């Protein structure tokens, strides 16, 4: 097993750790910051494993499969936890899920026709914006910052902040999904 794949497996292992920390944060608010640390480390492994795989020629079929799957599961797990807490709307999660299923379906059709649809720049941007946005939501929705910002800046600060992040994630996700289909529309022919 390559170093890059081992790093990807670390990300996979961190997903249930993140979920447990999020559940514990309901009883122990400081655990939201532990959740942030776990999520941030998991997100950083996405950058690291890709760079290592390319630099040291460790690109494998397992890595090509596992890396994007780990990204999707990590991000969707965080969004689902935020939905449960009432700070990430279900419609935004549905946009993300729909895009992921649609692009995966498009890729499967392409493979059936002997083509591979490579990751587009917009897909990488979607991942970066989503992971950064979720990190910011974890950071600022913690008890300390939420109370500080809502009390001393504006009572509705957190609501507005969360909606801006959700909006950015939804827009970049929609753009990325549309771009994949526009650039590869010939795959859907005959």
Label every model-predicted segment:
Residues 1-190:
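Alpha-helical transmembrane bundles and membrane-interface segments of multipass inner-membrane proteins
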């Amino acid at each position: 097993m390559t170093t890059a794949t081992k790093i990807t497996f670390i990300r996979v292992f961190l997903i249930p750790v993140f979920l447990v920390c999020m559940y514990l944060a309901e009883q122990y608010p400081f655990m939201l910051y532990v959740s942030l640390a776990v999520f941030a480390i998991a997100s950083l492994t996405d950058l690291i494993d890709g760079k290592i795989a390319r630099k040291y020629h460790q690109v494998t079929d397992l890595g090509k499969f596992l890396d994007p799957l780990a990204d999707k599961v990590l991000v969707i797990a965080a969004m689902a936890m935020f939905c449960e807490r009432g700070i990430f709307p279900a419609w935004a999660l549905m946009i993300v899920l729909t895009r992921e299923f649609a692009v995966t379906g498009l890729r499967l059709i392409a493979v059936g026709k002997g083509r591979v649809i490579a990751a587009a720049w917009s897909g990488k941007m979607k991942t970066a914006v989503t992971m950064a946005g979720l990190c910011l939501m974890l950071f600022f929705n913690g008890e300390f910052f939420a109370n500080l910002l809502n009390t001393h800046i504006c009572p509705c600060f957190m609501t507005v902040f969360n909606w801006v992040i959700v909006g950015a994630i939804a827009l970049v996700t929609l753009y990325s999904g549309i771009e994949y289909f526009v650039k590869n529309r010939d795959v859907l022919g005959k």
